[in-house]
């Protein structure tokens, strides 16, 4: 179109303009001047500038959406670069063995003999979405891949997908290639018979062998406020997890679950809550010093490293309440503060545990975990008898007992013993227990009653001679053996045989 000496190219709505370069060449960019109102069939158009978007293109068509008034068109092109070969791999392990920057077609197979790929976790959307995928051989981050079915945790994947394998800042990624990557040959399906994915338990020394995977590291101690563990693992809540995520504190021992996402040289774990597995579980180990939190921590999970027995009484104390529903099968007793003839009386009809208080317990369980509790900044308590002479003392951490007979422990035969020396830590009481502080010269026993003032038969008896009478005042012998059920007077005290 020539108007007053100005020449312009006009093409109208729904018409097309195709620009091509000679064979063996590729268009790298096109610059227009004037008014351009069109779309393109390949590459990327931004205003008056078009680029090939890193694709090999020797012809591009523009379709007008309205009238176009073009003054000039500058087409930049170069020799076609050799097409890079596309590697073929059959597992994530094989993918991660490639050099960074390699284009590859990843084949994921299903079935018992297949790689059984599963989606672990999805973060973000669109061209920056991170979908962490695990198969039987390893894990990788699918990055910027827009699937035909949205990625969701627990899905299984089978089929083929082409992308570029890169390692960025230590993170292995399988990235989308513009105009190449699609999921048309990839089956993305919800689980049918498969169990929900779970974290892989690893040791910190194997961190770099499990990049992009969902892992669990147990017994990690936080050594500073920067949430760094003794093994150099750093907790970074990059995903912004809020669901059942409780930030730990310096000195805490925790089980940590999350995605292994290195940050250059930093070994980071990005915590996630998934499939009822908490990102942080506090650990209280009877063998290790326990550090109390500065303030109460609500909705926490706590794992105890301790084995209990239903065959004998043992002492127990924890810095959180335990409701009756979480103590199924347990028998619990508290010190009533009553003492009779050096016998400390316990009430064995308790149904729950209060933070900080010392208890006796019978329970058949090992290393129990408690969910949704409040970890309290409550120091261990001491329960002292009414006369002030006998105490039942709770401890969370290992405690060195005195060797002067004033601090005693409960043995598995339910007798109260005192350490005679400190050799080989013979006087070391484990944490999550309680001990007895008593007069050094006293021969102390324990007894149980359903109510504080009830009469009961002691669990421990001395060799002191007995005189046993029935309620009619008749002498019936010097032993309790073979007596029928009933109420008796033994050395001046009422006793019930059931």
Where are the language model's segments positioned?
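A short, polar beta-strand/turn micro-motif
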Residues: 24, 70-86, 171, 175-201, ...
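A glycine-anchored, Pro-Gly-centered beta-turn/N-cap motif
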Residues: 28, 355-357, 483-487
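OB-fold nucleic-acid-binding modules
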Residues: 81-280
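C-terminal outer-membrane/trafficking sorting elements
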Residues: 336, 451-498
């Amino acid at each position: 179109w020539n108007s007053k000496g100005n020449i312009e190219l006009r093409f109208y709505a729904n018409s097309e303009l195709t620009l091509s370069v000679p064979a063996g060449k590729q268009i790298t960019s096109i610059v227009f001047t004037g008014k351009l109102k069109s779309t393109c069939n390949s590459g990327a158009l931004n205003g008056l500038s078009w680029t090939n978007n890193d694709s090999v293109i020797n012809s591009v068509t523009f379709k007008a959406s309205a009238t176009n008034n073009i003054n000039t068109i500058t087409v930049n092109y170069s020799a076609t670069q050799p097409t890079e070969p596309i590697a073929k791999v059959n597992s994530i392990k094989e993918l991660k063995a490639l050099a960074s920057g390699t284009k590859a077609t990843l084949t994921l197979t299903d079935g018992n003999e297949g790689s059984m790929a599963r989606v672990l976790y999805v973060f973000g959307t669109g061209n920056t979405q991170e979908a962490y995928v695990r198969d039987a051989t390893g894990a990788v981050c699918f990055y910027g891949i827009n699937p035909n079915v949205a990625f969701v945790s627990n899905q299984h994947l089978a089929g083929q997908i082409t992308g570029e394998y890169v390692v960025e800042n230590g993170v292995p990624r399988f990235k989308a290639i513009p105009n190449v990557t699609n999921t048309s040959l990839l089956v993305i399906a919800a689980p049918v018979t498969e169990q929900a994915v779970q974290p892989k338990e690893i040791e910190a020394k194997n961190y770099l062998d499990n990049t992009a995977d969902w892992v669990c590291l147990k017994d990690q101690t936080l050594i500073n406020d920067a949430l760094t563990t003794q093994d150099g693992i750093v907790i970074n809540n990059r995903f912004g997890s809020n669901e059942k995520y409780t930030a730990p504190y310096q000195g805490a021992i925790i089980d940590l679950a999350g995605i292994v996402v290195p940050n250059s040289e930093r070994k980071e774990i990005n915590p996630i809550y998934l499939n009822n597995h908490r990102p942080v579980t506090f650990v209280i180990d009877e063998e290790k010093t326990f550090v109390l939190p500065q303030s109460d921590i609500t909705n926490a999970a706590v794992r105890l490293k301790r084995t209990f027995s239903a065959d004998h009484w043992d002492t127990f104390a924890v810095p959180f309440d335990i409701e009756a529903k979480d103590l199924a099968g347990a028998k619990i007793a508290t010190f009533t503060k009553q003492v009779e003839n050096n016998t400390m009386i316990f009430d064995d009809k308790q149904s729950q545990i209060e933070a900080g208080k010392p208890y006796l317990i019978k329970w058949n369980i090992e290393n129990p975990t408690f969910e949704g509790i409040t970890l309290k900044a409550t120091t261990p308590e001491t329960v002292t008898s009414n006369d002030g002479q006998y105490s039942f003392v709770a401890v969370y951490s290992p405690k060195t007992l005195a060797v002067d007979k004033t601090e005693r422990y409960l043995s598995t035969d339910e007798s109260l013993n005192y350490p005679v020396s400190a050799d080989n830590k013979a006087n070391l009481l484990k944490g999550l227990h309680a001990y007895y502080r008593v007069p050094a010269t006293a021969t102390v026993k324990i007894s149980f009653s359903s109510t504080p003032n009830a009469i009961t038969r002691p669990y421990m008896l001395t060799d002191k001679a007995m005189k046993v009478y029935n309620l009619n005042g008749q002498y019936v012998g010097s032993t309790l053996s073979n007596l029928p059920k009933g109420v008796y007077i033994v050395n001046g005290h009422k006793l019930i045989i059931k």
